Amino acid sequence: GGPSQKQKQHKVNLVNIKVYI
């Protein structure tokens, strides 16, 4: 995906890690 806001990037990071594993 593409984090538009930096604040949302934090939430996307957690989800990305889960999908990455």
From Swiss-Prot:
Keywords: Copper, Oxygen transport, Secreted, Transport
Source organism per UniProt: Maja squinado
Major place of residence: secreted
Location of the protein in the cell: Secreted, Extracellular space
GO terms for cellular component: extracellular region
Protein name, per record: Hemocyanin subunit 6
Role: Hemocyanins are copper-containing oxygen carriers occurring freely dissolved in the hemolymph of many mollusks and arthropods.
Family stated for the protein in its record: Belongs to the tyrosinase family. Hemocyanin subfamily.
Tissue expr: Hemolymph.
GO MF entry, a single one: oxygen carrier activity
